[in-house]
Structures are given as structure tokens and as C-alpha cells.
Design a protein with these regions (language model features):
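Tandem CBS (Bateman) regulatory domains
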Residues: 1-10, 48-78, 82-91, 106-107, ...
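The conserved cystathionine-beta-synthase
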Residues: 13-31, 38, 77-94, 101, ...
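Short hydrophobic/aromatic-rich motifs at helix boundaries and adjacent loops
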Residues: 22-25, 37-39, 57-60, 69
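A glycine-centered beta-loop-beta connector
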Residues: 27-30, 35-51, 90, 98-113
């Protein structure tokens, strides 16, 4: 099974100037733990629940922006990578979210739950 089959709707997207409060609201509203940070050139970062927690723990306030806390220039994967290879890479790197990009276009973000479900699901 390839990641393409796990990428559903597009990722939730915010701009680099989005406040961290609004980033948290997007995550809560859409029940996601990561959002893509995109500008006019495309994907420039990913902001996760861990990034928000790290920011709070190190003293950022509600005036901070997505660009202040995001992981800039995140590693990305293509949609045709095998789920098992993605799982191995996530284990090796500690990543819990993988932006899936094809021909420069963000298709979505696959998280560790998606990957684990695909590996253990009898329908996979």
C-alpha cells in the first residue's frame, strides 16, 4: 500500500503570519495535530501540537506567529512511497507527521496514526 491511498482531503493550511492562537484554533476545529504553513511559493513549514507546546514551555506569548514556531523546510515524501517505508522513516526520525507532496503540490499530511492503521488494518 502506498501513501497516496492514505492522503484524503488536503492538509489544513495556515500562512506564516497566522497567530499561534489561530493555529491552535484550526487544529482544534479540524481535529488535527499538524498544519501546513504555506506562502505564495508553496509549503514553507509545518506546525505541530508539539511545536505549540514547545513554544508555550519556552515563553512565547499569543503574539507569536506560525513562522516563529514552525519546523521550516520540512522533509516531505511523495505519494508513491510504501506505507511500510514511511513507517520505518517515521520511527528512525521521530516524525509523527509527513507532508505528502507531488510535483511541488501539497497533497496532504499523513500522521503516524494513519500509517499504523494502514499497517494493522485487515483491509490494507
Amino acid at each position: 500500500m502506498r501513501l497516496r491511498s492514505l492522503v484524503g482531503n488536503r492538509a489544513e493550511i495556515v500562512g506564516p503570519e497566522t497567530s499561534v492562537v489561530d493555529v491552535a484554533k484550526v487544529m482544534l476545529e479540524h481535529n488535527v495535530a499538524a498544519v501546513a504553513v504555506v506562502d505564495r511559493t508553496g509549503l514553507i513549514g509545518i506546525c505541530t501540537d508539539r511545536d505549540l507546546a514547545r513554544g508555550l514551555a519556552t515563553g512565547c506569548d499569543d503574539s507569536a506567529l506560525a513562522s516563529d514556531l514552525m519546523t521550516a523546510s520540512p522533509d516531505v515524501v511523495g505519494p508513491d512511497i510504501e506505507v511500510s517505508d514511511a513507517a520505518a522513516w517515521m520511527l528512525e526520525t521521530g516524525y509523527r507527521h509527513l507532508p505528502v507532496v507531488e510535483d511541488g503540490e501539497l497533497l496532504g499530511i499523513v500522521d503516524i496514526r494513519d500509517v499504523l492503521w494502514a499497517l494493522v488494518s485487515p483491509d490494507a
